[in-house]
């Protein structure tokens, strides 16, 4: 088996397979990946600025670009959060970085997840976008277990131009996503 970058694979194989299956007349009608958003919600970040900095460095290593600090939209007294306090990090990947991250996710990260039986097929939102979470950042090859002070999970959202969940699922399956059998 030869390594083919995912963007090339999409243009040569996946797009044609999708056109045949769904009967598209034009290649521009075929769903494609738009972006991947990685979000880390860090509740402790409002009290400890160092935690945000540590996880920002980790997320930058994982994604290949600097994350944006997300801030609280409004104050919530029960959580001791004021408006504007840092409560998380997010990265939006597009273009080549998106395809590189997707390749790493499918081939390196998901196989390393403990007790992994496949991705939940119910993670679609009705508009062709897929969301799932990882419970720890240690499954990424860039993160060394010795340097991790605190295990932190993340949410990953894959945004496609697909109109329906069925089209999006087929697109992601052709990219190599390991979904659970229903």
From Swiss-Prot:
PROSITE patterns attached to this UniProt entry: RIBOSOMAL_L5
Gene3D superfamilies from the UniProt entry: 3.30.1440.10
Sorted UniProt keywords: Ribonucleoprotein, Ribosomal protein, RNA-binding, rRNA-binding, tRNA-binding
GO cellular component labels: ribonucleoprotein complex; ribosome
Signal sequence coordinates: none
Pfam families: Ribosomal_L5, Ribosomal_L5_C
Gene Ontology BP, a term: translation
A GO MF term: tRNA binding
The keyword RNA-binding is assigned to this record: yes
InterPro entries, sorted: Ribosomal_uL5 (IPR002132), Ribosomal_uL5_bac-type (IPR020930), Ribosomal_uL5_C (IPR031309), Ribosomal_uL5_CS (IPR020929), Ribosomal_uL5_dom_sf (IPR022803), Ribosomal_uL5_N (IPR031310)
Keyword tRNA-binding belongs to the record: yes
Self-association state and partner proteins as the record states: Part of the 50S ribosomal subunit; part of the 5S rRNA/L5/L18/L25 subcomplex. Contacts the 5S rRNA and the P site tRNA. Forms a bridge to the 30S subunit in the 70S ribosome.
Function, as annotated: This is one of the proteins that bind and probably mediate the attachment of the 5S RNA into the large ribosomal subunit, where it forms part of the central protuberance. In the 70S ribosome it contacts protein S13 of the 30S subunit (bridge B1b), connecting the 2 subunits; this bridge is implicated in subunit movement. Contacts the P site tRNA; the 5S rRNA and some of its associated proteins might help stabilize positioning of ribosome-bound tRNAs.
Family: Belongs to the universal ribosomal protein uL5 family.
Protein name, as recorded: Large ribosomal subunit protein uL5
Organism per entry: Thermosipho melanesiensis (strain DSM 12029 / CIP 104789 / BI429)
């Amino acid at each position: 088996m030869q390594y083919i970058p995912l963007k090339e694979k999409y243009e040569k194989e996946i797009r044609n397979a999708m056109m045949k299956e769904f009967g598209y007349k034009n290649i521009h009608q075929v769903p494609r990946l738009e972006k991947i958003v990685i979000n880390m919600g860090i509740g402790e970040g409002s009290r400890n600025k160092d935690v945000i900095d540590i996880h920002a460095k980790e997320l930058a290593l994982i994604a290949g670009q600097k994350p944006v600090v997300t801030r609280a939209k409004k104050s919530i007294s029960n959580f001791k959060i004021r408006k504007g306090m840092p409560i998380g990090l997010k990265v939006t990947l597009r273009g080549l970085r998106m395809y590189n991250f997707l390749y790493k996710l499918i081939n390196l990260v998901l196989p390393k997840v403990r007790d992994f039986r496949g991705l939940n097929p119910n993670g679609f939102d009705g508009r062709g976008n897929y969301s799932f979470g990882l419970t720890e950042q240690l499954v990424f090859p860039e993160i060394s277990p010795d340097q991790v002070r605190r295990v932190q999970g993340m949410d990953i959202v894959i945004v496609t131009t697909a109109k329906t969940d069925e089209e999006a699922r087929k697109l992601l399956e052709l990219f190599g996503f390991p979904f659970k059998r229903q």
